[in-house]
Amino acid sequence: MEIAVVEALEKFYGKSDREIRLFYSPGRVNLIGEHTDYNGGYVFPCALDFGTYAAIRKRDDKKVFMASLNFDLKVEVDLDSIFYDKEHDWANYPKGVLKILQEEGYEFSGFEIVFGGNIPVGAGLSSSASIEMVTAVAVNEVFNLNIDRINLVKLCQRAENTFVGVNCGIMDQFAVGMGKKGHAILLKSDTLEYSYVPLNLEGYKILITNTNKKRGLLDSKYNERRSECEKALTYLKKALPVKNLSEVTVERFEEYKDLIPDEVLRKRARHVITENKRVLDAVKALNDNDIVKFGKLMIESHNSLRNDFEVTGKELDTLVEEALKLKGVVGSRMTGAGFGGCTVSIVKEDAVEEFIEVVTRNYTQKIGYAPTVYVTGVGEGAGEVEYLRR
């Protein structure tokens, strides 16, 4: 894929003696800690070993040419006039990054950029954050903007929030921008305090299973859940001096939950508060080398997302149910925003083939179409890639 984007840039925009540089940004999966990030809580993502490549070449004018090996659409943008255009589809993500960089006072000329990746779009594995981050890192490096990585992460989140209009938390951009091979990231969403936790998965594999249900984050119930959490917090604030739901302990919630008059809002808050504790318990389990305990917490997380947060649906539930029937599966849960997308499972290496065969067969029988299973590793965060021409 990396050489393909370099060759495509020359094919689409011609050869020249100007240097073509190559950058990469991974996808991510959140192992546990779902719908906690916009509630100020803990999340536990890791970068994956697949992602988005971008080949970039400077120009002298203010024109930016964008193309992708994954989509037919090619886009031309004038740096003096960047605005959201629904017709530009995927290109609005990198365009948003350029707009935010300009708003922050950074100057750069035009360029040609060609993207290509192997992250399934709409699966909840952060294809959007990956394309944002690879754009930000590429422009930062090529034009010597000297922006530190955490600020690049924040810029990319702002691009998705304000330019594209998706009210996402910061986890996706943080995971793809700050990922570290062989480690997951324990991230506190409101303060951005973080630490790397070694993922000692000897004898186990991470399997990501895509429901292949069509969905879009923009038109899902994501923003509705966010607003429900904010309403629940308003009630709890009457008795508790807290800034967000994640500051409420499970014990305090049990004591004060009746302040929330609406049962639905109470369930939403209960998920966030218990999920936050599950993340910390999961990190402890990993540090204790207790992969079985980690798996149990993943299952509890899924049950809470199904029963209290109500964001799973029959496709995700079927994948988890079928996975948990197999002996070699220690844990499985939905990951991402929900309503489709993917599950993440921890599976013994010698059970991977059985998982793929049995889960695919049973899901297809129950749902009517097949899922896609990815066996993945934990990869590096975004950065420049050396390449050799063919």
UniProtKB/Swiss-Prot annotation:
GO molecular function, one term: magnesium ion binding
EC number: 2.7.1.6
Binding-site residues for ATP, renumbered to this chain: S68, G122, A123, G124, L125, S126, S127, S128
InterPro entries the UniProt entry points to: Galactokinase, Galactokinase_bac, Galactokinase_CS, GalKase_N, GHMP_kinase_C_dom, GHMP_kinase_C_sf, GHMP_kinase_N_dom, GHMP_knse_ATP-bd_CS
Gene3D superfamilies xref list: 3.30.230.10, GHMP kinase, C-terminal domain (3.30.70.890)
Chemical reaction(s) catalysed: alpha-D-galactose + ATP = alpha-D-galactose 1-phosphate + ADP + H(+)
Swiss-Prot/TrEMBL GO biological process terms: galactose metabolic process
Subcellular location, principal: cytoplasm
Pathway(s) served: Carbohydrate metabolism; galactose metabolism
Active site positions: D172 (proton acceptor)
PANTHER family for the chain: GALACTOKINASE-RELATED, MEVALONATE KINASE/GALACTOKINASE
Protein name: Galactokinase
Species the sequence originates in: Caldanaerobacter subterraneus subsp. tengcongensis (strain DSM 15242 / JCM 11007 / NBRC 100824 / MB4) (Thermoanaerobacter tengcongensis)
Lineage, highest ranks first: Bacteria, Bacillati, Bacillota, Clostridia, Thermoanaerobacterales
Protein's gene: galK
